[in-house]
């Protein structure tokens, strides 16, 4: 196994390809909990393309890398997802497959894109086009993790005040602890990036 260290930011590129025509639906910067938590993925934020020449070059490189990866793997009439590391001068494809990245379908739905309707159109031989969406504000999907051991309880008042969507993987009363992998999420939120919860959305009690 040959490994190489690449300095840059990690992105998830997700979309659909029909008749060898790839349509990129989302470009999201990926975040992690850091070294102390084994770099477990903590969420995504969609990247908006501006009119700057820097952004034009960045997105052009992403489009070229996506097309080359899909062609090399002979992926067509399918969903696709790429993990890339982007530095100042290049885009490196780390992984490419036919499944969307974790919960990206929910993020696309929040953006107004029904990815499953698009996929049905593809497999039934209908033509599809890139949907028009409002990209004026970045969309964030954040995974919720326990920072200690305890019994999980939902802070319903905070959930009701949150300007976004909240989904739970755990049920109230479940014993949870600090994460060892992405499968240990308590739940996740989707919102416009500026909309942060004003209060914790959950409690961890010492007893049920």
Give a label for each model feature:
Residues 79-81, 139:
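Extracellular structured ligand-interaction cores
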Residues 11, 25, 94, 140, ...:
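A broad, low-specificity signal marking well-ordered, structured residues that form hydrophobic/aromatic
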């Amino acid at each position: 196994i040959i490994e190489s260290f690449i300095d840059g930011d990690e992105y998830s590129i997700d979309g659909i390809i029909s008749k060898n025509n790839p349509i990129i639906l989302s470009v999201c910067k990926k975040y992690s909990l850091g070294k102390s938590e084994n770099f477990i993925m903590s969420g995504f934020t969609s990247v908006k393309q501006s009119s700057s020449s820097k952004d034009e070059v960045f997105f052009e490189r992403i489009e070229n890398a996506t097309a080359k990866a899909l062609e090399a793997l002979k992926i067509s009439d399918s969903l696709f997802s790429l993990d890339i590391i982007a530095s100042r001068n290049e885009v490196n494809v780390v992984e490419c497959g036919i499944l969307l990245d974790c919960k990206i379908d929910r993020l696309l739905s929040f953006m107004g894109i029904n990815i499953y309707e698009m996929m049905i159109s593809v497999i039934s031989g209908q033509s599809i086009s890139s949907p028009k969406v409002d990209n004026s504000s970045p969309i964030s999907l954040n995974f919720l993790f326990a920072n200690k051991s305890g019994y999980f309880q939902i802070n319903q008042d905070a959930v009701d005040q949150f300007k976004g969507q909240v989904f739970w993987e755990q049920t109230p009363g479940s014993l949870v602890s600090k994460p060892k992998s992405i499968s240990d999420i308590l739940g996740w939120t989707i919102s416009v990036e500026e909309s942060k919860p004003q209060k914790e959305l959950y409690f961890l009690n010492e007893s049920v």
